[in-house]
Structure formats: C-alpha cells, structure tokens
Amino acid sequence: VEGLRILDIGCGGGLLAEPMARLSGIVTGIDATAEAIEAARAHAATAGLDIDYRCCTAEALAEEGASFDVIYASEVIEHVTDRRLFAASIAAMLAPGGTVVITTINRTLASLALAKVAMEYVFRLVPAGTHNPARFVKPHELRSEFAGTGIILDDMTGFAPRPARRIGGLHAEQVRLSRRRGGCGGCDRALRHRPRPALRG
C-alpha cells in the first residue's frame, strides 16, 4: 500500500480510507454527502491522519484529470443513476496497471430479504429507504456497463460477510476489475503492490 494513490468512492466517515492511510497509502476519499465528509475530516484530524477528503462525485473528480493506482467503491454503484457514466469515470481515473474493486448487492431474493428487510426494518442498521431493490446489480449487468471503458472483468466472487461482523450478512457480488493494459489481479495483491503480469489481448 505504501505510496499507492488510493481513491475511496463513497467514503462515508472514512471506514476504509483510514486503514489505508495508516498503511502509508496516499488516500483520497470522496462522498456526495457534506455531513459525511465533515465527519471524516474531523475523525482523521483526531487520529492524526493525512487524508484528502472531498465532497464531490466520481464524475466531477474525473473531469479534474485525477489519477489513482487503486479505486475502491463499496456499496456505491447500486445507488448511482447512470452506472455507465460512473464506470467511464472510474476508467478515466485509473492509472495503467491499476486496480478497481467494487462491492455491490446482487439482485436476488436473498439480498432483498437481508439488505432491504433485515438491515432497514428488522435490525435498523441503516435508515429505511436506503436501498432500492430495483437498482441491485446482476453480475452480467456490470460486465455490460464496464465494457468499452478499457477495464475488463478479472475476478468475481459472491460472498456473505460473517454475522459477527455484520448482522445478518449481505449476499453481494465482489467484483475486481483491472485495466486491460498491465492489469493487476485481485485486490489483496494490488494493495501489496505485487501486480500480476500484464494481461494480453
């Protein structure tokens, strides 16, 4: 992680950004909610961490010509209105050989029960109305939406977090995407700065 330029899209209060900064990553966190950015900045200051938090969208940041080695968007794309534009913005910001990691909620009955019903109404871990099941994302839809951006699907893994870490667990799709020219493989390898050989074709 040391020295890697890392972008956390939809950073919220900095749950991912802070650990990456502690590992000496050069971290930028963006969120469209001003209150989240204010809270993230305050917490980072208290922890003595140097993180560049900005209240903006991925699309706006891409227009500035920003470039990153690792781009992470966790539980974000299912809230995006134009996913193809979102994918194009990520592609524009990804440095050659860089890695993108996306986690999102698969559109299944199990996900509906857990992410919508359980999380919002049973355990009340997120506000009611947070999730719109119509925007949950099927794997083949992600493949289609990222096609033509210069990013190819490298690895896709379905997972359910352990109940001890998140009540109920969400069935989701963890998608790792890498640029066709010199793509890194899985996120664990990318964050250790040990990329796989360049992909051909």
Identify the residue ranges that each predicted region occupies.
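Acceptor-substrate binding/catalytic loop of class I
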Residues: 124-141
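Conserved class I S-adenosyl-L-methionine
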Residues: 4-10, 99-123
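Class I SAM-dependent methyltransferase SAM/SAH-binding core
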Residues: 13-60
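Hydrophobic adenine-recognition pocket in adenosine-nucleotide-binding enzymes
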Residues: 76
